[in-house]
Amino acid sequence: MHHPSRRQLLKVAAACGSVGALGLSAPAIGQGLTKVTFTTSWIPEGPNLFAYVARDKGFWKKNGLDVSVARGSGSGAAAQAVGAGTFMFGMGATPTVIIQAAKGLPITCIGQINYDALMGIGVPANSPITKAKDLEGKKLGASVSSGEYPFLPLYAQKAGFDLSKVQLVQLDSKVRDRSLTERLVDAVAAFGSSTIPSLASTGSDVRFLLFKDAGVEFYGQSLTTQPARVKSEPAVCQAFVSGAMEAIRFIMTEPDEALDIFLKANDEVSMTSSGKEYARIGLGLANLTNLVPEVLQNGLGWADPAKVKAQSELILQYAAGQGAKMPDLAQLFTNQFVGKIKFTDAELAKARKSVEPFRKYVA
């Protein structure tokens, strides 16, 4: 029988010591990394950039996980895939997840990725439209299939303008942004998180009047899993959320390095002439939406139960459709795994400085 030499044993001990220094949990050392499947809600872009950083910078590995990242084809499809158990974890637009839950999908939001869906009205940067009232008498491009469309009447009511005096131009969402740059319409109803990077990265300056500023507020995107997993595998859920939130803190304080990591992981983005700028602006906007009281007071990922209730009630009233029922919000949202990752004063200062160039788009 072969007996290991003292030198070999010392090498093993040193290796274990270096792993321990990385902060890996005992199960990760003893049993290897736990394999986890995760789907984003869309193609690689700013709002899901954190996932590639969490994977490739080692934040998930540090928490004992080997996470595969799949690209999604929309928040609705991503939510359904998670609810069905096709993926262990996912992400999606929070309003869409609430709608799916209201229709009976078993799903739980386990951490906020960002805090504003940036629903609003996009106009050229030099447009004379500076407030919602200015939309009266103008052409507003809108797509009935887009998530913000059902809330236009509520926005008009809250922002103090007469929607009947606005000329609504129905557009396919694929040509909506282009219609604005070609001045076929004066403004568009859209998600700023998508439209702003799309237009600004190709040289078309744009700014948004946000629904949020009129009191119509919705969270941006949530991490999701199945309710059963929260109960059966809380340690895996905790490791997944912790790694994601550490990555979000990193992309907010070191956005340039984060962007480099993302581009190396997604060649198709870096190969296009506007791809890097598209990702940079998308990341900046996502980071901007995370500098909110929820994060500053309670840590990254924390969801305000009062806001969740108010947002869910609006979604049920305006967007969920027939047959939808108010989901059990205590099951739909949990803060069990969040609140542990926070900013130091120095990190917060860096994060605030890094988002300044992006405020002009939503000022």
Give the predicted meaning of each segment.
Residues S25-P27:
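N-terminal signal peptide c-region/cleavage motif recognized by signal peptidases
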Residues P95, V175-D177, V185-S274:
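Pocket-lining segment of extracytoplasmic ligand-binding domains
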Residues I29-E182, D186-S193, L209-L210, V216-E217, ...:
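Short, glycine-/small- and polar/acidic-enriched structural segments
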Residues V308-A363:
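Conserved C-terminal helix/tail region of periplasmic/extracytoplasmic solute-binding proteins
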Residues S18, K212-Y219, R280-A286:
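A glycine-rich, aromatic-flanked flexible loop/lid motif
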Residues E233-Q322:
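Secondary-structure end/capping motifs
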Residues M1-G17:
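N-terminal secretory signal peptides and thylakoid transit peptides that target proteins
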